[in-house]
Design a protein with these regions (language model features):
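Extended hydrophobic/Leu-rich segments
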Residues: 1-3, 120
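ATP-dependent carboxylate activation and anion-phosphoryl transfer catalytic cores
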Residues: 50-124
Length: 124
């Protein structure tokens, strides 16, 4: 089975999901070229109805729990045409560069880079 509809990521910080980010690229997946070379890659707020947003967050928090993770991580997923979610991978040390998804999501809710780093360090 090949799922090619929507690629997204959900950062989790101290037990709470930050806004999901949808990744749109002309590449076949979010690879090095899509991240750093291509100018057409878009990182968009992933808009969902409340019931699907709650489902997505529960999947991500359950994934965190099953993996035994805490503090911070990022869950990468696909969503198919029937709106089902599939976990691709868990990033236990998400990127923190200017191109990285975790700080971009935090920024979208007004959490500065410095505040984000402090929350990660202090675990609060």
């Amino acid at each position: 089975m090949c799922i090619r509809d929507r690629e997204l990521t959900v950062p989790i910080l101290n037990g709470r999901c930050l806004p999901a980010v949808e990744i749109r690229t002309s590449e076949s997946f979010y690879n090095f070229n899509a991240k750093y070379v291509n100018k057409d890659t878009q990182l968009l707020e992933f808009i969902l109805p409340n019931n699907k947003k709650n489902e997505l967050e529960q999947i991500c928090l359950k994934t965190m729990d099953v993996m035994g993770c805490r503090c911070w991580l990022r869950v990468d997923l696909l969503q198919d045409k029937n709106n089902n979610f599939y976990v691709l991978e868990v990033n236990t040390v998400p990127g923190m560069t200017s191109h990285s998804l975790f700080p971009k999501s935090a920024e979208s809710i007004g959490l500065s880079y410095n505040d984000l780093v402090n929350e990660i360090i202090n675990g609060k």
